[in-house]
Swiss-Prot record:
Function: Plays a role in the nuclear pore complex (NPC) assembly and/or maintenance. Required for the assembly of peripheral proteins into the NPC. May anchor NUP62 to the NPC. Involved in nephrogenesis.
Sites bearing Phosphoserine, chain numbering: 4, 10-11, 57-58, 69, 86
Cellular-component GO terms for this entry: kinetochore; nuclear envelope; nuclear membrane; nuclear periphery; nuclear pore; nuclear pore outer ring
Transmembrane regions listed in the UniProt entry: none
Record field: compositional bias (Polar residues): 35-49
Residues modified as Phosphothreonine: 46, 55, 64
UniProt protein name: Nuclear pore complex protein Nup107
Disordered as annotated region, ranges: 1-66
UniProt source species: Rattus norvegicus (Rat)
Length: 926
């Protein structure tokens, strides 16, 4: 049946199930074909470097502000977008731009423009693959937060991108940041989409992270757009600003305005940015819009009117419009058919959504698709008038734009003010005419509201410029004064935003990324740093890890551009992020962020991190990474060792005079022992390893932890002293070693002598207590037992002789080693020879205390050995050694210790007297 005649037909609206199924089947088939085609040609989230100019506001022609360096001989192809994009702006920023993402679709398949936007943010340029499905399934089986697990790779991805780009490609870097976020958003969206209602609570964190990464993605997009323009502007000369001629057209005037006025230009960039966000979210209209595909509008009303003309009509006589011109419902104040009214409301809402996304051409296509070509025409009137033939020429060129744009705009303004129209229809024409008051009621989110303000601001500033620069004889009614004379500033926009009565907008205004976006738009880096400081002081530990990553890389971006950031805030952000990386075990990333701290802080921060690294292989890797990041590895490793060895709050204590077992080695002691490993990786640090090892061993010796001290000693490579001398000679130095190194070597040898003496004493002590036992014979032993006893006695005598010989050798050895300590060459044990070294009061104090703690005890032990082996005369010679002015050992003895030493010497003298000798061991002369 020919529907165009409408004769004797039932309602033509697609409400019949069969028709609906058929239509939807056809539509679905077409969408599949379109989607398959677009998957090969379009990324579902448009890379920012490939954004085709949109139509974000009225008075837009295909325009991207060209580089001002080209203004002497302007290339019109840049202005009109016919040859390529401006080198300054990857993203179209022109107030006059009028190209959509899809420019070659006819009216019959307009829906294809949206099929690749099915998931909006939740899409990416990558093709779906079986491998990706498997990876997603694996991620979803992980612990409590699959989103966090899936997005963990972003930390390393961002660092790799940062290291890959130089300062000259900083905007390519920002674009890569955005692409990383987009890829991750794609993954998280798939995870969320597969969540069931039973495990939605588990995936709620993933959904929150998805939103967070979406916001980060668009913030990088905004940053690149604004700062590319700002940097380019700062490099260009002020006197190259474009000025329109006297008889310039509207279009020429506005082009010149965009060239010279950064406020207008950057405000338009904000509008473009907000429209790109809306475009990402817009979805697939082929699924959402349910209009009948005939190019006849208000078809149900038309059908009802046709039916009423028939004499046999018995249906409803409810009042309807009697005419079907576009103004009829308003003029007659009569309604449309209910179904048409529903479709009309739905259509207007989607039209506004398209306008909000800067897709005016798509909105016009939709109007024509739905039979409202007249409405498509009303969306055309914003184009700026330009007659290229005014300046003469051999050939006539077509005139552009609307010569009656002022009348059109006033009509749009009035239409937006008329309460008889639907709120979305009023909002459409409010957006076209710059009527902020009528545009705000349909703006429910922060992005929508900011878009409304900035769109109207640009519209107003452009209109003011046209009014003052374009000569016209038209004396038609003006737009309202408050619109034409508005004094717009970026700060004023956000002040107005703060005063809104919409609760949702106020809440969203406080969200982290919206605060960042606000200060980026304002260009207020100091204000942004103050906000960062507030966040850190208020909730440092609860800030999302990805937000900290963003904050860190934003600061690095500003530094790369040479922009000043508040140093103390930048440092705190970096330190907080580094601590996050430490907590999350991102070991390979820490060095490269630490190197951006001031040197002293970098050393302290990385040393703090290394304290927790215990595996040898991992330690070596961390030092290699520190070298790659140009950190001061030598100072860092020294700091690590000093930090750990100074953690013990134990003090040097006086030894008791009795030989006792070593104090047990604790876990804290084990940390101090192992920390020396940090200094032995690099041979150039052998001198430092020696110094730090000595410091640790001094403390262990004071606490009688000889085994722990020995373990530290073993950690120092045996060739360390030779290595120190070799390195000094390789530097071509003919002078002696530095005093610090010389003294460290001597101290190392002192400790070695003491440990050897102590070890030999312990060995002798154990051997002395392991003497063979003399066999015993029972009183009533048999002959056989007596024979066996004789054999045992012979074996005992043999074993005892061997034992005695070994004991004598050990005794001689321990005597020698103890004398080596007590009579240490060149000034004594633990006494520096070089006095020209840098003063170290703590070390000097410890060495004096060690002499007082160890030497008296060693002297008593030596006396015990000599006395127990009957060497009484040599015992008395200890008095000569202690009192000698050459060695001055008496200075390290306390009065109590000297008294005890004299008591022991008295005992030895008595033993000599018992042997018939004089008190000093000499024969008594008769």
């Amino acid at each position: 049946m020919d529907r165009s005649g409408f004769g004797g037909m039932s309602s033509p609206v697609i409400r019949d199930p069969e028709v609906t199924r058929t239509a939807r089947k056809h539509s679905a088939h077409k969408r599949v074909l379109i989607q398959a085609n677009q998957d090969e040609n379009f990324g579902t989230t448009t890379p920012r470097s490939q954004i085709i100019p949109r139509t974000p506001s009225s008075f837009r022609q295909p325009f991207t502000p060209p580089s001002r360096s080209l203004l002497r001989h302007p290339d019109i192809s840049y202005i009109f977008g016919t040859e390529g994009r401006s080198p300054r702006h990857i993203q179209s920023s022109g107030y006059l731009g009028n190209l959509s993402m899809v420019t070659n679709l006819d009216d019959s398949n307009w829906a294809a423009a949206f099929s690749s936007q099915r998931l909006g943010f939740y899409t990416n340029t990558e093709h779906h693959s079986m491998t990706e499905d498997i990876n997603l399934s694996t991620v979803m089986l992980r612990e409590d937060d699959p989103g966090e697990a899936a997005s963990m790779s972003m930390f390393s991805d961002f660092l790799q991108s940062f290291l890959k780009h130089s300062s000259t490609t900083v905007f390519d870097l920002v674009e890569e940041y955005e692409n990383i976020c987009a890829s991750q958003v794609n993954i998280l969206s798939k995870i969320v989409s597969r969540a069931t209602r039973w495990d939605w609570q588990k995936f709620s964190k993933t959904a929150s992270m998805l939103w967070l990464l979406q916001q980060e993605m668009v913030t990088w997009r905004l940053l690149a757009s604004l700062y590319r323009d700002r940097i380019q502007s700062s490099l260009e000369e002020e006197n190259m600003f474009a000025i329109a001629g006297i008889n310039a057209s509207e279009k020429t005037v506005v082009e010149a305005l965009f060239q010279r006025d950064s406020l207008v230009r950057q405000s338009q960039l904000v509008v473009d940015w907000l429209e790109s966000i809306a475009k990402d979210e817009i979805g697939d209209f082929s699924d959402n819009i349910e209009f009948y595909a005939k190019s006849v509008y208000w078809e149900n009303t038309l059908h009802s009117l046709k039916q009423r003309q028939l004499l046999s009509y018995i249906g409803s006589t409810r009042p309807l419009v009697t005419e079907l011109d576009p103004d009829a419902p308003i003029r007659q104040k009569m309604p449309l058919d209910d179904l048409d009214r529903e479709d009309e409301v739905r259509l207007l809402k989607y039209l506004f959504t398209l306008i909000r996304a800067g897709m005016t051409e798509e909105a016009q296509r939709l109007c024509k698709r739905c039979g409202q070509a007249w409405r498509a025409a009303t969306l055309e009137g914003w184009k700026l008038h330009h007659d290229p033939n005014v300046n003469g020429g051999t050939e006539l060129e077509p005139v552009e734009g609307n010569p009656y744009r002022r009348i059109w705009k006033i009509s749009c303004w009035r239409m937006a003010e008329d309460e008889l129209f639907n709120k979305y229809e009023r909002a459409i024409y409010a957006a076209l005419s710059g009527n902020l008051k009528q545009l705000l009621p349909v703006c429910d989110t922060w992005e929508d509201t900011v878009w409304a303000y900035f769109r109207v601001m640009v519209d107003s500033l452009v209109e003011q410029e046209i009014r003052t620069s374009v000569m016209t004889l038209d004396e038609t009614e003006e737009l309202p004064r408050e619109y034409m004379e508005a004094n717009w500033t970026l700060e004023k926009v956000f002040e107005e935003l703060q005063a809104t009565d919409k609760k949702r907008v106020l809440e969203e205004n406080q969200e982290h990324y919206h605060v960042v976006q606000k200060f980026l738009i304002l260009g207020d880096i100091d204000g942004l740093m103050d906000e960062f400081s507030k966040w850190l002081s208020k909730s440092r530990s609860s800030l999302p890890g990805h937000l900290l990553r963003f904050m860190t890389h934003l600061i690095l971006f500003f530094r790369t551009l040479g922009l000043q950031t508040k140093e103390e805030v930048s440092i705190e952000v970096l330190k907080t992020y580094i601590q996050l990386l430490i907590n999350e075990k991102h070991t390979n990333l820490i060095a490269f962020y630490t190197c951006h701290l001031p040197q002293d802080l970098a050393v302290a921060q990385y040393a703090l991190f290394l304290e927790g690294v215990t595996e040898c292989e991992q330690r070596h890797q961390c030092l290699e990474l520190a070298k790659e990041a140009d950190l001061d590895v030598a100072t860092i490793t020294k700091t690590v060792v000093e930090n750990i060895r100074k953690k013990d709050n134990g003090e040097f204590s006086h030894h008791d005079l009795a030989p006792s077992l070593d104090t047990a080695t604790t876990e804290e002691d084990r940390l101090k022992i192992d920390v020396i490993d940090w200094l032995v990786f690099d041979p150039a640090q052998r001198a430092e390893a020696l110094r730090q090892g000595n410091a640790i061993m001094r403390k262990f010796l004071a606490l009688k932890k000889h085994e722990a001290a020995k373990e530290v000693f073993v950690k120092i490579p045996q060739d360390s002293i030779a290595e120190i001398y070799n390195q000094w000679e390789e530097q071509g130095m003919e002078s002696p070693l530095p005093a610090e190194d010389d003294n460290a070597i001597r101290e190392h040898l002192c400790i070695r002598a003491y440990l050897e003496a102590h070890e030999t004493f312990n060995e002798r002590f154990k051997h002395m207590n392991s003497a063979p036992q003399k066999p015993t014979l029972l009183s009533q032993a048999t002959f056989t037992e007596k024979v066996a006893h004789e054999h045992k006695e012979k074996k005992y005598e043999m074993d005892h002789n061997i034992w005695k010989g070994h004991l004598d050798a050990l005794t001689a050895d321990v005597k020698e080693k103890m004398y080596n300590v007590l009579l240490f060459v060149d000034g004594g044990w633990m006494v520096d020879v070089r006095e020209d070294a840098e003063e170290d009061p703590e070390r000097a104090h410890q060495m004096v205390l060690l002499r007082k703690l160890c030497l008296p005890m060693l002297c008593f032990l030596l006396h015990t050995i000599l006395h127990s082996t009957g060497q009484y005369q040599e015992c008395l010679q200890l008095a000569d050694m202690v009192s000698s002015e050459r060695h001055k050992l008496y200075l390290v003895f306390s009065k109590e210790e000297l008294r005890k030493l004299l008591q022991k010497l008295r005992e030895s003298s008595l033993m000599l007297l018992d042997q018939g000798l004089d008190p000093l061991g000499y024969e008594i002369q008769s």
